Design a protein with these regions (language model features):
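Cys-dependent protein tyrosine phosphatase-like superfamily
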Residues: 1-126, 138-237
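Ser/Thr-glycine-rich phosphate-binding loops at phosphate-binding pockets of nucleotides
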Residues: 131, 135-136
Length: 237
């Protein structure tokens, strides 16, 4: 995969100092924000002047709890135990990953992202959600699969988020424990698991058959743009 064309991240609400300088050096022209309206309001991106933002709310049509609502549950030990206990947290995220494939707002968001990357006028580009692991993780995973990266390498790349976010969520887990909660309840929400990506892949194969068919029929990306996307992102042998 060519370097310097597509980037992923968590939200950019704390971008400043050396990080802002490093970001500017990447020459990123467009940021695609996959978050909900309440997430964007809670922590707006801080971007260099001249960087365009495109909002692609993946979960706009979801009837499940929003990410901000889930975080609010962390403050109530009883509600957290009810929602996340007995495998509830993992089951909730598996539902969300299934929504990434079938939800109309998700397909619209990912279609617009893929179409823009295929066109190339927006690049270098970056896409992100709040933690950069779920909505962003699925986008990165199916992009890599579409480009022909082997399944095991895609899974390994997806699971890197678990290591990189471990320190980020440590204060949240410690605070939950200090209030008397069991931090293990929150682990399914603050990390990534193979079963999450496998759930999305299973739904994709069930509904569309192949990655290429998902991009063509689920996202509505036609032959020309699909060819353009591969040509732009695959490094020549």
């Amino acid at each position: 995969m060519r370097r310097g064309i597509v980037y992923r991240s968590e939200d950019l609400g704390r971008l400043g100092g050396d990080d802002a300088i490093a970001f500017a050096r990447l020459g990123i022209r467009t940021v695609y924000d996959l978050r909900t309206a309440d997430e964007r309001a809670a922590r707006p991106d801080r971007l260099p002047a001249g960087t365009a933002t495109v909002v692609l709310d993946v979960l706009h049509g979801s009837t499940d709890a929003t990410p901000v609502q889930l975080m609010a549950l962390f403050e109530d030990l009883r509600l957290a135990a009810e929602a996340f206990g007995d495998g509830g947290g993992a089951a909730m995220f598996e539902r969300k990953y299934r929504e990434f494939v079938v939800l109309e707002s998700a397909r619209t968001a990912y279609r617009r992202l893929f179409a823009a990357l295929a066109d190339g006028a927006c690049t270098p580009a970056l896409f992100h959600c709040t933690t950069g692991k779920d909505r962003t993780g699925w986008a990165a995973a199916f992009l890599l699969l579409f480009l022909g990266v082997p399944d095991d390498a895609v899974m390994a790349d997806y699971l890197l988020s678990a290591d990189r976010l471990a320190g980020t969520f440590r204060p949240t887990l410690d605070a939950f424990a200090a209030r008397g909660g069991d931090p293990d309840l929150l682990l399914p929400l603050v990390g990534v698991r193979p079963s999450y990506l496998e759930t999305a892949l299973d739904e994709m194969h069930r509904s569309y058959g192949t990655v290429d068919a998902y991009v063509a029929n689920g996202l509505g990306i036609h032959t020309g743009p699909r060819q353009n996307l591969r040509a732009r992102l695959i490094e020549p042998a």
